[in-house]
Structure formats: C-alpha cells, structure tokens
C-alpha cells in the first residue's frame, strides 16, 4: 500500500515551517502483521497531508533484526525493532538514531508468556529447559527471557527459544509443539484472539522483569535525518501525535486498524483486541528506555563499556528527552 499526499503546505496542526521549494520525499518501510505502526496510523489520519511526504509499505518485516538489515542496506528509510536489537546494530557499526518508541510496556500493554491451563509451569524458575515460542531471536522477547532468568540467578540461555510467527503462536501452544508462547506487547491483537478461545494461563510478563519502559523503537539512518531534517522532524512529530490519538481514541483507532488490515488481506477481526501502543503521553522516550538496555548489553559483554551513549542515540525534534 502506498499512501501519497501532495506537497501543498505543511499540516498546520504540527506548527512546522514550509520552505518555498518543498521537495517530495518517499519514506519506505516494512509493515508488521496484525497491526499498524504509529506512522501508518498518522498517514491514515491525514497527519502527513500537505507535507510532501509519501510513506510506502514495501512488504512485511520478518522480525525487528530483519527490519534493521533492510534499513542498513538502504532498501527502506524506516526500521523498527526491539531496543536491544537496535543497540546491537548500532554497536556493530550502523549509524542509526532512535526516532520514537514504536510501542511500550505498562499495565495496559505488555508482553505475556502463556501456557496451557494444565501446564506445571508456574514461575520463571520453571521455564528452565522448556521451549518458548517467540516472534524472532535477538529481539525483545529473547532479551526478556534472558533478563528474567538472570534476575533469578539462573543461566540466561537455559530456556529453548524457537521462532514462530504471531498468527501461529496460539496453534503451536495448543498443539503441544512448545511449552510456552510469548505474545509480544505489539501482538495484543493475537493475544486477545487466543484468550477468547480459553484454556490459557499467564506465567509472567515483561513488566514484571523490566518495569514500564519503551519496548522498541522506530529507527532512522542518521545520514537520512541530516539530509532531510524537516522531513525527519515532521515524520516523528506526526507519528507521536498519532500515538496520542490512539491513547485518547482507542475505539476509533481499532476501526482504522481493522480497515487497513482488511485492505491488506489480513484478519481484520483481531483489531478489536488492540490495547494501545503502551507509550507515555506525548510519545517521547526517556533516556532510561535506552540506558537500561545499554547496561544489560555491557553486563553481558555484548558491547564495550562506553561504546553506546543514550543521548547520542535518541533523535531530537527539539524537545530534549527526560532523564528518568
């Protein structure tokens, strides 16, 4: 799906200046099954009208790390991945900036690890040696499992993780192919559908492990933001505005998501389980969203101490992020 708006004038609601020779800019991205990113919602709401910005869906992301590979390779302008995956990619040499939180975890939106009702698994300690279905390796759910085990004094690699696409998480759990299915905070549509069928029990969630924090980020290449500073600012401000819209108008957001999913040929029914994006009001990150994972990666020896600096990674539209 390509969403195009003519370059007439900047959206007045954003309060942004318009240069006399406003060039049209195409922003390519990979979509995720079962939901919309905030920039997709922003486009549906008309927040890019008159900005000269075109956002173009060029396919589906097979997990956050694959999205970052596409971003690094130049086949998209926007990536999206769990914070730890973003930091690993930056540490490996990719000059990315974290534009805005794609989702977050709080009491309303969280990743939950489910078992069947009759499962003997009842705590983090019980997941040792068990098989857990996650959407991808090296991303949010992977690191949540590692951190949960670490906090209990257990080896971080003592559970077996297997990759299962979101639409199949319920199926593999009910069929006994895995012991646990982890439904990510961005997969609340699939979670709701699974719970509707009954017979599942939550063991733990990522807020138990991490507290309230951004779960992942929409990511831009730094060179692109320098070449297109106005467009980068518009993109972020329109997207964070859409995050607030979803918070304030959840039912309308569900209607939009359902319509777009139907247009994509996906199951529109799951949109009714959309629980929000789980981010703070205003959609802006705080440094802890990044620093928490920097500390984890340094502790694990994945990155050298001091290699990553949270403030340098966070993209700024002029509003400095808070520090806590």
Q: Where are the language model's segments positioned?
A:
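Conserved C-terminal helix/tail region of periplasmic/extracytoplasmic solute-binding proteins
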Residues: 295-324
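Pocket-lining segment of extracytoplasmic ligand-binding domains
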Residues: 84, 162, 167-259
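Secondary-structure end/capping motifs
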Residues: 225-304
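Sec/Tat signal peptide C-region and signal peptidase I cleavage site
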Residues: 18-23
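Bacterial N-terminal signal peptides
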Residues: 7-17
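Short, solvent-exposed loop/beta-turn-alpha elements that line the ligand-binding surface or hinge
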Residues: 50, 103-106, 208-211, 278-287
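Short helix-capping segments at alpha-helix termini
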Residues: 47-51, 151-157, 195-198, 264, ...
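Short, glycine-/small- and polar/acidic-enriched structural segments
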Residues: 24-155, 162-163, 179-185, 212
């Amino acid at each position: 799906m390509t969403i195009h708006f003519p370059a007439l004038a900047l959206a007045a609601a954003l309060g942004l200046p318009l240069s006399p020779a406003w060039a049209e800019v195409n922003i390519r991205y990979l979509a995720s099954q079962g939901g919309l990113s905030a920039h997709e919602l922003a486009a549906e709401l008309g927040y890019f009208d008159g900005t000269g910005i075109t956002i173009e869906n060029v396919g589906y992301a097979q997990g956050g790390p694959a999205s970052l590979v596409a971003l690094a390779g130049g086949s998209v302008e926007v990536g999206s991945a769990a914070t730890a995956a973003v930091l690993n990619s930056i540490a490996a040499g990719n000059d990315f900036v974290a534009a805005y939180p794609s989702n977050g975890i709080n009491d309303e939106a969280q990743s939950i690890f489910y078992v069947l009702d009759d499962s003997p698994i009842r705590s983090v300690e019980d997941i040792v040696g068990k098989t857990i279905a996650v959407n991808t390796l090296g991303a949010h759910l992977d690191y949540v499992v590692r951190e949960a085990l670490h906090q209990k004094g257990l080896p971080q690699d003592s559970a077996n993780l297997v990759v299962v696409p979101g639409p199949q998480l319920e199926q593999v759990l009910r069929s006994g192919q895995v012991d646990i299915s982890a439904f990510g905070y961005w997969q609340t549509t699939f979670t709701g559908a699974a719970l509707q069928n009954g017979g599942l029990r939550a063991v733990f969630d990522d807020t138990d492990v991490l507290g309230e924090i951004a779960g992942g980020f929409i990511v831009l290449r730094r060179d692109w933001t320098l070449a297109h500073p106005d467009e980068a600012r518009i993109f972020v401000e329109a997207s964070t505005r859409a995050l607030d819209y979803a918070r304030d108008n959840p039912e309308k957001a569900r209607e939009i998501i359902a319509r777009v999913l139907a247009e994509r040929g996906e199951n529109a029914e799951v949109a009714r389980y959309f629980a929000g994006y789980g981010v703070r009001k205003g959609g802006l990150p705080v440094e802890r969203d990044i620093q928490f994972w920097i500390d984890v990666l340094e502790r694990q020896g994945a990155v050298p101490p001091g290699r990553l600096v949270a403030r340098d990674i966070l993209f700024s539209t002029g509003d400095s992020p808070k520090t806590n």
